[in-house]
């Protein structure tokens, strides 16, 4: 189970926010403070991790709409990448799995673009970065962990 999520440049959240998830998590706030945006983020993440789509994100997942255009997801609508982080903690094995991604938007094509993603495992004794991909161009990513370029279509 994912125990924490963090996000930056998402909807009305310019600064990095971290939410610790428990079996029951309650969001309280004034109108237009971002409660619905946070809830929609959960379906956005679920859709992305589920691998059901060709895009990094889909604006509609399980009949929940996150916006009309992909730039609706970005704080200020353009010029920034959404940064998302997910942490899964295993208290028995005393380790954390950490996934971080950054997604920008091609406004002309109305498509999300995966800029970077990394995955690491952290335990009491060390931190092992398993993947750290950075986008070089439209079809090429570089993994900083093994110094290898990967071509994608």
Model-derived segments and spans:
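P-loop NTPase switch/coupling surface
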Residues: 1-153
């Amino acid at each position: 189970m994912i125990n924490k999520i963090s996000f930056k440049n998402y909807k009305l959240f310019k600064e990095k926010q971290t939410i610790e998830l428990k079996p029951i998590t309650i969001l309280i706030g004034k109108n237009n403070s971002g409660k619905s945006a946070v809830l929609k983020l959960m379906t956005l993440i679920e859709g992305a991790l589920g691998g059901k789509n060709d895009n990094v994100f889909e604006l509609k997942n399980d009949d929940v709409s996150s916006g009309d255009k992909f730039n609706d997801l970005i704080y200020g609508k353009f010029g920034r990448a959404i940064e998302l982080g997910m942490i899964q903690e295993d208290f028995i094995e005393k380790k954390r799995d950490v996934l971080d991604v950054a997604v920008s938007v091609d406004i002309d094509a109305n498509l999300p673009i995966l800029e970077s993603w990394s995955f690491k495992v952290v335990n009491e004794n060390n931190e092992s970065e398993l993947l750290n991909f950075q986008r070089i161009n439209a079809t090429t990513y570089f993994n900083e962990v093994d110094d290898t370029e990967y071509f994608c279509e």
